[in-house]
């Protein structure tokens, strides 16, 4: 039996998935194919390296950050069902079509520090219902529970999409010959227990005590109260780390730290934490800041940052109990 295409899969889905939403998701997928092609060319097209400027986050932009952002903006701002866009790379939102039913938020190229060393990167997206005929900045201020779809595209040895429309999580793999996303896994589930964790251990001295205690227990392994050994994984790309968790379980932590105490966290709520939390929860996992469920946070600004602890439910609950 042949694999369903992404478009065929969307036609069969129920619940939040309207024909208009399916069209928006199809457009995102098509644009990610274009991003994938640009990544494949890499140095041959002269598009590696820095673009020579910073984004709104104060981060140095890579050329492919800018290219990927432009591809998504250009494709979605003319889409008849998109009322507005917000990108991690831009200061303000981008108005789109009057009476567009949906708002799209995205990180065009997560993990872009990996580009020049040819390691995995990804695109993350979140879709919210539009509130007004003409989109205003305040319309984006919706909790993650209001998302009607979320997903990412992982550009790795194969190019894959993870997608949820509120009815579980599915994986699609891009056929390099036909350039079609084909359904390869349905009903993705995150195991409740794990022996893998992902954290940037170089920040250990800046962590709060609950996170220090939790990681110390994992590192002590069998000699600690955990009575089993753990392995650490870190690929400097949230898409890569979350994809591993969806495939075989695990916990990912980017906690609050005192390195820059004015920042509530490092990752962006609207572009990273919310869509990834929806995916993980739809697959049976859990997501928190350590103190509150991420999807219940009421945002106050487009580029709001939060701590993120996400993955296998029992581990997330354990580290939360230490806070």
Swiss-Prot record:
Its cofactor is Mg(2+). Keywords: Carbohydrate metabolism, Cytoplasm, Hydrolase, Magnesium, Metal-binding. Mg(2+) 1 binds at residues 88, 107, 109. It is found in: Cytoplasm. One of its GO terms (biological process) is fructose metabolic process. It catalyses: beta-D-fructose 1,6-bisphosphate + H2O = beta-D-fructose 6-phosphate + phosphate. GO terms for molecular function: fructose 1,6-bisphosphate 1-phosphatase activity; magnesium ion binding. It comes from the Bacteria. The keyword Oxidoreductase does not apply. SUPFAM superfamilies: Carbohydrate phosphatase (SSF56655). It is an enzyme of class 3 (hydrolase). Substrate binds at residues 110-113, 200. InterPro entries: FBPase_C_dom, FBPase_class-1, FBPase_N, FBPtase. Mg(2+) 2 binds at residues 107, 110, 272. Pathway: Carbohydrate biosynthesis; gluconeogenesis. GO terms for cellular component: cytosol. Binds 2 magnesium ions per subunit. The keyword Magnesium applies. Homotetramer. HAMAP family: FBPase_class1. Belongs to the FBPase class 1 family. This is Fructose-1,6-bisphosphatase class 1. The lineage of its organism: Bacteria, Pseudomonadati, Pseudomonadota, Gammaproteobacteria, Moraxellales.
């Amino acid at each position: 039996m042949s694999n369903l295409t992404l478009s065929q899969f969307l036609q069969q889905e129920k619940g939040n998935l309207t024909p208009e939403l399916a069209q928006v998701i199809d457009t995102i997928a098509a644009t990610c194919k274009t991003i994938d092609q640009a990544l494949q060319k890499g140095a041959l097209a002269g598009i590696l390296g820095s673009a020579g400027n910073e984004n709104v986050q104060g981060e140095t932009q890579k050329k492919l950050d800018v290219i990927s952002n432009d591809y998504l903006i250009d494709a979605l701002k003319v889409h008849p069902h998109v009322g507005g866009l917000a990108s991690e790379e831009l200061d303000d939102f981008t108005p789109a079509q009057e009476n567009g039913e949906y708002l799209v938020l995205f990180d065009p190229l997560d993990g872009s520090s990996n580009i020049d060393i040819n390691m995995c990167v990804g695109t993350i997206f979140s879709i919210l219902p539009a509130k007004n005929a003409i989109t205003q900045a305040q319309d984006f201020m919706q909790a993650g529970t209001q998302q009607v779809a979320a997903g990412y595209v992982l550009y790795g040895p194969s190019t894959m999409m993870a997608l949820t429309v509120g009815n579980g999580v599915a994986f699609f793999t891009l056929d390099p010959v036909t350039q079609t996303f084909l359904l390869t896994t349905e009903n993705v589930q995150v195991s409740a227990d794990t022996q893998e964790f992902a954290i940037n251990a170089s920040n250990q001295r800046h962590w709060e005590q609950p996170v220090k205690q939790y990681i110390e227990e994992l590192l002590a392994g069998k000699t600690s109260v955990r009575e089993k050994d753990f392995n650490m994984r870190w690929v400097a790309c949230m898409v890569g780390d979350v994809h591993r968790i969806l495939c075989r379980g695990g916990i990912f932590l980017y906690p609050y730290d005192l390195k820059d105490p004015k920042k509530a966290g490092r990752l962006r709520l609207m572009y990273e934490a919310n869509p990834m939390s929806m995916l993980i929860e739809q697959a049976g996992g859990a997501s928190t800041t350590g103190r509150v469920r991420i999807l219940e946070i009421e945002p106050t600004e487009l580029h709001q940052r939060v701590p993120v602890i996400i993955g296998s439910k029992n581990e997330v609950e354990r580290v939360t109990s230490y806070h």
